[in-house]
Amino acid sequence: MKQLVTFKIHDGGQEYESFGVYDHKYSDVRIIEDFFSIENMREDYDYKDNYWWYDDKLVSVVDRVDIDDDKIKIMNDYGVAYEHSI
């Protein structure tokens, strides 16, 4: 089974969420690296409370919930979340 991963992004005065579907086996840091296409996450990218710097934004994994294949297809069809392979 896969997980629906919810990202919180702070971009200046704006805050929004984005979603991706990943295997259970990956850490939050590895998922952030993949989702935001960060080549090598460095220690100094760590900010606080599990937020990481990405360009001029703070990003974090705020939720991971199990999701079945039918729901993955629906999310994909509506362009809400896509399945990622690392």
Residue ranges and their predicted role:
Residues 11-14, 79:
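Glycine-centered tight beta-turn/hairpin loop motif at sheet-sheet or coil-to-beta transitions
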Residues 15-26, 30:
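A short, exposed loop/beta-hairpin motif centered on an aromatic-Gly-Thr core
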Residues 9, 21, 37-38:
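Generic detector of N-terminal low-structure segments
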Residues 3-11:
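A short beta-strand micro-motif
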Residues 38-86:
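Short, mixed-charge low-complexity intrinsically disordered segments
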Residues 1-4, 17-18, 49:
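Short, surface-exposed beta-edge/turn micro-motifs
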Residues 5, 22, 68-70:
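Short, low-complexity interaction segments enriched in Ser/Thr/Pro/Gly
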